[in-house]
Amino acid sequence: MYSVLFRQAEESSQLAGAKGMNLIKLTKHGLPVPDGFIIQTNALARFMEDNQLQETSENVEGGIISGTFSDELKDELTSSFYKLRESYRSVAVRSSSASEDLEGASFAGQYETYLNIKTEEEFLAKVKECWASFFSGRVSSYKKKMNNQIAEPLMGIVVQGLIDSEMSGVIFSRNPVTHDDRELLISASYGLGEAVVSGNVTPDTFIVNKSSFEIQKEIGAKEIYMESAAEGIAEKETSEDMRSRFCLTDEQVIELAEITKKTEDLYGYPVDIEFGIADHQIYLLQARPITTIDQDKKAAEEKRSFMITDTDMNDFWLNMESNIEGPVSPLFSSFIVPALEYGLKKSMQKFPIGVVVDEVKLYRGHIYSKNQGGQQPPSEDCGKELFPILSEHMYDIINHTYLPFYRTLDQLAQTEHTAESALEAFQKLKAFYLTAYEEHFNIVFPQILLTNKLQAMYQDIQGESENAHFYEMLTGKMNKSLETDRCLWLFSVEVQENPNLLAIFENNKPEQLQEKLEQTDEGRHFLKNVHEFLQEYGWRSVKSHDLIEQIWVENPYFALANIQNYVRNGYHFDNEFQKTKEKREKLYNEFLESIEDPGLRTEFDRYYQWTLNSANIKDDHHFYIDAMLDAKARIFLLKIGELLAENGVIQDREDLWFLYDDEVEQALLHPVSLQEKAEKRRQIFHEYELAQAPAYLGTPTKEQLKAAEEIVGAVIEDEKNTENHIFGIAASSGIATGPVKIIRDANEFSQFAPGDVLVCKMTTPLWTSLFQDAKAIITDTGGILSHAAIIAREYGIPAVLGTRTATERLRDGDIITVDGSSGKITVVSRS
């Protein structure tokens, strides 16, 4: 017998191949598998015998393709094919080697899969192609690499009814990104599953807690989908509506999770599953061991002292995402995690702010702090001697600590290093990060104490805890972010006054501007001025905290795109800034006059003037410390990357970001190739970028959650949310109605149009250029003192922040009303 139905076949990889054996197991245990049959491994042996072929024959692949079926073999196979076709419009033909999908050798993508097979001729041809794939060069090479020695060609074939999947994807019963046994991960998109499996689409991602079935989800672009055509498979573009919504409902995700748990229980080890959904029915198309997870975990995600362990998960850890966006690269984590912990602990001893940070660690590439509540509130006089001079205090530290070190870094970036000098400079940089973040918090914490003091006075006088108006009384104060914007606006004024420059900016895309400007004398002079501007204001990157992204100094594209935006929208910076300043003065004078007690009025005014004088600290310290330190470090570290690339440690200097500090130090003195490790970590880093990290870990008390929200904003979704109402933190007052535009990163800035409501995870100073066009601002993370809140108040537009779910629940084109005074978002109509 050469062919046998799934439900009748023996669970033997030697007869059915590994893929076939798994489908037989699933079918016999009642899991939802489309009907099919196995062409057993003895069929290939018979075919080779009939055609006088041996495994050692020259061009055995070609011999199989040109070979002929004996009548006996052909009749049996085609009879099974026609019986299956009675129930299905077409079939899928897949290779099923005895070696494939077994532990230690997944052979993923090494063999063949053919979809939408309808005729006998196609069927027999694809059977031969599957057999031939066993002898292909790429498979032989892979088997050699995996130390897989097969004595005889044990290649079976799976023939399965083709499900015309409306949605499909892959499930990992153990999270392959974090290796967390408590979670499963689903990648899904529209149409047939080949688009997801082959990596041709950016799928939706669902992470499911296997106990509580709590779902975290990240929407993917889902650029295309595949479907059965008259012949073969057709690839089509997804519609805007399809892209903007999740392809699976929560109910479907939970049902998939339940089936996955049953499958995992059946095997007794982690599995991955390919699935399809048609007519509301879930089908399992394949299941196999997750063969590389332990090796990947060992090779690519070594547990370091600053990574959260399983034991750590018993404590309460707060995601620091409102301050540090997204996952951080391995090298940057080596610098920033120890620096944050050191700086927080040292500074909190001097300036207690009501919370204690015990540790700072990494989870899924994201930075978390272990917070401890219950600290004694600061004394009345804590930091008071600095209150009148906070801004001056900051600039004294910047001038005496940071700027001299930056000049040293600039020199080091121009130096041709030996391994020894590079190592010495690298270690100096690591040590400076500790100093830098101690001083960072020495600047920030006294300002927090002062602002909290003034806010408490304000609330005592008002008799309420409404915050938006309080912070609007602190707007209209120039800072480095606004100063940068004003310089860019002045460039736009120059463009508008010069017809030749104006033509370039009006008629070209942002990425074309530099090339066009370089073609004329006026353009070259303009670029020269832009480059001079960048030497002062360009020490910032697309990603606010990391070394991994280009900085403005390296590429004038970012500045030119911002200038073009000002040219396009006709925004007048000075006029708008003056309006904000006048609004602030009016608000404050009205409030001050409402205080009847002269002594209280005088005391409030004194604290207010101190607070207003220090209102630039949030952005100025970011400009000189957070952004500039990482930018200067990047330029220097690229020299280290060049040295390692020359010595064969890595292929490209920017692979450096995917090594840890100790590996860099060892490789400088004892070069060995770390390229494979760097590539694996780069892949994992990008997976972290796509996944949604939890807002917190552990099981916090209500008091811990409350304390956390006072620091970073909302950490859980508001329980008042309904289908058409979302609540968040009221961060900038006013009401506005407009269409939603979800922006996920800087690459999408050009899609934002004047009058849109900006919806995003969070903002950094790079995003400031969008505020001049925005009707309102909505974020998933952040609180009343976040960048988005401060800049929204400066631009006088409503902002609701810390919604946790806005980027998931809203879609491009939805018409919404944003009430920045109450923190309420209302969906007026769906797109």
UniProtKB/Swiss-Prot annotation:
GO terms for molecular function: ATP binding; kinase activity. Coiled coil: none annotated. The keyword Transferase applies. Pfam families: PEP-utilizers, PPDK_N. Keywords: Transferase. The active site is at residue 787. Belongs to the PEP-utilizing enzyme family. This is Uncharacterized phosphotransferase YvkC. The lineage of its organism: Bacteria, Bacillati, Bacillota, Bacilli, Bacillales.
